Amino acid sequence: MAGRVKIKQKELIDSTVKNKNVMNLFHEIIGSKGNINFSVVWPKFKKIKQSVYDYISTLSVLEKASVMQNFEDDKKMLELFVQKLWAAYEGYFKYPEIEKYEVEGQVNFNQVPHYVLEKFSQLYRSRINSELVTLILNSCAFLSKYNDYILKKDPYILTITPGLCFSPIPNFEDLNFKYLYNSDKNSQHDKDFIMFILYKLYTAALGVYNAISIPDIDVEDLENIILSSVSQIKKQIPRCKDAFNKIESSVHLLRKNFNTYYSDYVGSGYNPTIIMEQYIKDISQDSKNISPRISYQFRTIIKYYRDMIATKHQTMDPQVLNLVKHVEKKLDMLDREKN
């Protein structure tokens, strides 16, 4: 049954490609025009939400722990800080409108009112890029430098490393784990507990980072769009079989390297063209498999696009133009290497 759903989905994509600009479809799937794939994004959002909850809960456990009775001022400051984090969490991550449609952790988005989905779509990006999530990601970046020690609960970082301060939370340097751990007021049990809290804090922050890194799209949909568009174009451009075969066979690079592409996409400020640029670059750099004949066929395909746009008196999308120039430049480089 699942296979049949995928077949129908591909048939729908094939039909849609015939009637819509491929770059527009790409923008829609990647979500750069405000569209999001709820079946992908909602589970991702829930993972981020759970990990943020775990992070704040860990700090809350520390604040209420008996060990903090020995540090009254620190306890009060931590209590106020945790309250601020919970208030931010409530504001950013409460979406009861969608959650009430969940059945055993799954949502049939066809049954969710459009206005609810529209609201979530509008707020999604700002939520995962919120100050709260950014704080936790920065905390993760700091702690990741001590990954091996923390995961082994090795107190080396709190005892031997130079300096008097080990504060892993941005904007809250008062929470100094090195000071807490090395206090004469603590028993060995207290020290073990503090190290455990640091471990839980790091694993929760890692959970946020890993969830944030999940692509917002179905990579298979993107593959199908590329393959379907090639299928339509190849009928109109004769004697370019090898180049089209190269594109079709290389489409799996998209799946193989997509995590890297997606990281570049996020790092670029959500510029979807980055994904296509890196994908085309990977195809072009496979120089041992690109003969002068295939290079010529790639140029023919590019010329077809330019002629088609010129005939229709259209202005080429600057992003598409950049891709074309990039491919031409890479092909020139490959030609020089082979001569």
UniProtKB/Swiss-Prot annotation:
Main localization (coarse): host cell
Localization of this protein: Host cytoplasm; Host nucleus; Virion
Keywords: Host cytoplasm, Host nucleus, Host-virus interaction, Late protein, Virion
Induction or repression: Expressed in the late phase of the viral replicative cycle.
Protein name, entry field: Protein H339R
Coiled coil spans: none
UniProt keyword annotation of Transmembrane present: no
Gene Ontology CC terms, in alphabetical order: host cell cytoplasm; host cell nucleus; virion component
Subunit structure: Interacts with NACA (alpha chain of nascent polypeptide-associated complex).
Family of the protein in this entry: Belongs to the asfivirus H339R family.
Tree of life domain: Viruses
